[in-house]
């Protein structure tokens, strides 16, 4: 079975070799672990965001950035495009932010290949029937501070690898790399909802593609958390190739998947978050989904779509001003 860590390693090494070109910084910790600062003390870049996103996806996806194919001529934003032939493993086995890394006073949301070594969370890997056994651990951290040796030791211990084989990539939400990688979760938002909310077997998803606008840097991490989520919820478009079984209701699945099925639809994410007293667990799971879902049923040949992009909410979220 393909290894998400070994598939990502060449991309990590490429980033290290091109760190000046990518506007990132490489830091070697005293215990031998390697930290790639992609936005804490550096600017980062679109290219770094693209590679960071590809690593989050376990190296099992094509990631591109374009100014074309956006929403309409009235609102032009750069977009991130994702295509994968391994949807379940790439999105849920790697990209899903399923590891809350907490060591002392350090906290970060962890995603990427190392999760498949630490089995974080175990239930996800049981459901997609996947586990990695590589001797290298690559973890992507969404945080505004860089990790230290204690964090690297913790990751090494959880993943069962030598700490010298640990690579930690860090990008704050309020950074270009952070904005790119969150919009790059457009396909994962759909597979996550399929599995977590709709209890659909995501192993039936054979191919997937998606595109979402990239949030401009409009403020601190909290404001950017709202804006980056809105890019997918109100601007993300996805396409899933599913090989259904006879008992599967693909039309019902398609109708339930987009963010418009959530009770909180129509409000910028930050408003919803505030109403939930800043508690993610109080937010309707159905909201975490792309705006538009199209499904091609490979068994029946049917093609169904549901949802719409919502430019009005995007403009409100970004405080978009036409002058």
Swiss-Prot record:
Record keyword Lipid metabolism present: no
Catalysed reactions listed for this entry: 5,10-methenyl-5,6,7,8-tetrahydromethanopterin + H2O = N(5)-formyl-5,6,7,8-tetrahydromethanopterin + H(+)
EC assignment: 3.5.4.27
GO terms for MF: methenyltetrahydromethanopterin cyclohydrolase activity
Domain of life: Archaea
Pathway involvement of the protein, from the record: One-carbon metabolism; methanogenesis from CO(2); 5,10-methenyl-5,6,7,8-tetrahydromethanopterin from CO(2): step 3/3
UniProt xrefs under SUPFAM superfamilies: Methenyltetrahydromethanopterin cyclohydrolase
Any GO BP annotation: methanogenesis, from carbon dioxide
Protein's UniProt keywords contain Cytoplasm: yes
InterPro entries reported for this sequence: METHMP_CycHdrlase (IPR003209)
Broad class of where this protein is predominantly found: cytoplasm
Subcellular compartments: Cytoplasm
CDD domains, sorted: MCH
Alphabetical keyword list: Cytoplasm, Hydrolase, Methanogenesis, One-carbon metabolism
Any Gene Ontology CC annotation: cytoplasm
Stated role: Catalyzes the reversible interconversion of 5-formyl-H(4)MPT to methenyl-H(4)MPT(+).
Family membership noted in the UniProt record: Belongs to the MCH family.
Protein name: Methenyltetrahydromethanopterin cyclohydrolase
Biological source species: Methanococcus vannielii (strain ATCC 35089 / DSM 1224 / JCM 13029 / OCM 148 / SB)
Lineage of producing organism: Archaea, Methanobacteriati, Methanobacteriota, Methanomada group, Methanococci
């Amino acid at each position: 079975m393909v290894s998400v860590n070994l598939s990502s390693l060449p991309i990590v090494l490429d980033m290290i070799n091109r760190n000046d070109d990518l506007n990132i910084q490489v830091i070697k910790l005293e215990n031998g672990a390697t930290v790639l600062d992609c936005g804490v003390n550096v600017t980062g870049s679109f290219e770094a965001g693209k590679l960071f996103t590809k690593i989050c996806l376990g190296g099992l996806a094509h990631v591109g950035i374009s100014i074309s194919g956006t929403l309409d001529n009235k609102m032009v934003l750069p977009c991130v495009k994702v295509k994968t032939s391994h949807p379940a493993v790439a999105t849920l086995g790697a990209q899903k932010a399923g590891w809350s890394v907490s060591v002392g006073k350090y906290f970060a949301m962890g995603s990427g290949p190392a999760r498949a070594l630490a089995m974080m969370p175990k239930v996800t890997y049981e459901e997609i029937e996947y586990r990695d056994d590589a001797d290298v651990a690559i973890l992507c951290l969404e945080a505004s501070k860089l990790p230290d040796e204690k964090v690297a030791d913790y990751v090494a211990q959880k993943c069962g690898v030598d700490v010298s084989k640990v690579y930690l990539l860090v990008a704050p939400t309020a950074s270009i790399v952070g904005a790119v990688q969150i919009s790059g979760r457009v396909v994962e938002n759909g597979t996550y909802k399929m599995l977590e909310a709709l209890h659909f077997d995501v192993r039936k998803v054979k191919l997937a593609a998606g595109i979402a606008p990239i949030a401009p840097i409009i403020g601190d991490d909290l404001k950017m958390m709202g804006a980056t989520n809105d890019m997918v919820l109100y601007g993300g478009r996805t396409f899933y190739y599913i090989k259904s079984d006879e008992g599967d209701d693909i039309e019902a699945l398609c109708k339930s998947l987009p963010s418009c099925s959530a009770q909180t639809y129509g409000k910028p994410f930050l408003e919803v978050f505030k109403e939930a007293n800043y508690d993610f667990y109080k937010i309707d799971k159905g909201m975490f989904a792309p705006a538009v879902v199209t499904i091609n049923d490979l068994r029946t040949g049917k093609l169904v779509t549901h949802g719409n992009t919502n430019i009005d909410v995007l403009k409100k979220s970004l405080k978009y001003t036409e002058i």
